[in-house]
Amino acid sequence: LPVNPVQTRGNMANMQFRVVAYKNNSITAANYAGTAVYSTNASGIASIVANTATPAAVSGQWVLRPGTYAFVFYSYGTNSAPAALSGNWSTTVTHNQDFMLCQKTGVDVKADASGQCLLSGISFSRQCAQLQLCVVAKEFNNNTVQQCAATISGLSNSPVTWNASQTTLPVTGTSGTLNVAWTNPNATTVNSNVYKVLPQTSRTLTIKFTTLKIGNGQMNNAITVSATNRIFSAAGNYKITVSIVPNYISVRSYKWARGNLYKSGSNFYFEAAQSNYHGGATEGGFIGWNTLDIGVGKYNSGNYSTANDPCYQVVPPGTWETPSDGQLQDMINAGVTYSGSPTGFW
C-alpha cells in the first residue's frame, strides 16, 4: 500500500523531515516497518524525496502493508535529509540544531479511493530553545562595543541521544558548551547571533568573553560572569543580558580600582561590587602595606617591592599597584566626591 502523500500544518518551508513507521502501533526497534524522507516546498507542503523510501515500489513510492501503525517524524529544520535512525531506533542532537518532532499513533493504514493512504495533520514541535546574549557597556570613556565573542559552559550535555519512543529530548548533564558570536557590534548595546540550545533544568551557566573590545580597551579572556537559575524549555526564547562597567574610576591621570581588595586562598581579587567588603581581620579584606599576609599587625616596613604588593598580584599581574603618597595626594587634590563621601575618598 503506497504511503506517499502527507498533509502538514504550518510547517517551515524548504525543510526535509524523516518519517519512520512502526507496525502493530508499537514504537520499538523490533517493530520497525520502514522509513522515507519528505521535503516541504515554499508553501510548507510536503512531498516524498526520490529514492529515500524503504520499502519501496518499483516506482519509488513508499509501501507498507495494511495495518495499524505508529509514525515518528523528526527534522533538523534544514533542507538536508535527516540521517536514518541508528538501529532503526535512535539518533543524536547537539546544541545549535533545530530539532523537531511529531508522533502519530494508532494510524490505520488502508487504501483510499486512489489506492493510497494519506498521513494528515502532521505538526512539528521544536525541542530546543533559542538563546541570545546581550552586552551593555556603561561608564567607559567610549562605550562602543567593537568586538565581542563568548563561550557559554554549563549547558546540557551535547550530543544527547534521543530514541523514537521519546516525545521530548532528554535533559542530561552540565558539560555542554556553546561558542557565541556577534556579527555586527559597534554599538553600546549589542545582541549576539541567535543560537539553538538543548533544553535544561535550572542550573548556573558560566559566560566567558573570549574576545571583547570596548572603546579602545581590549579585554580578551578578562571577564567571566555567572548566570544563575537558568531554565531552557523546549521552543522557548531566552536572552541573557550582561552589563559591563570598568573595574576602575578615572581620577585625573590615574585609574583607581572600583572594588575593594581581598585575598582568597593564595590569590588576590577585587570585589565584584563597589559596596562589597570581606569583613573581619582574618577574612581576606584586612591587608597591610607591602605584604601578602592578611590579618591584624601584618605589614612590611621595608622598601616597597612589587613582589610584596598585594595589588600587583591581582590577575593579570602587574596591572595594579598600591598607590604612593604622591598618587594618593593627587586624588585628594582632584576634589572628587562619590556618594557623599569626604572629598577625594570613596
Label each residue range with its predicted role.
Residues 31-53, 161-185, 225-228:
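Solvent-exposed serine/threonine-rich low-complexity stretches and specific carbohydrate-binding patches
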Residues 215-251, 319-320, 337-344:
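Hydrophilic extracytoplasmic domains
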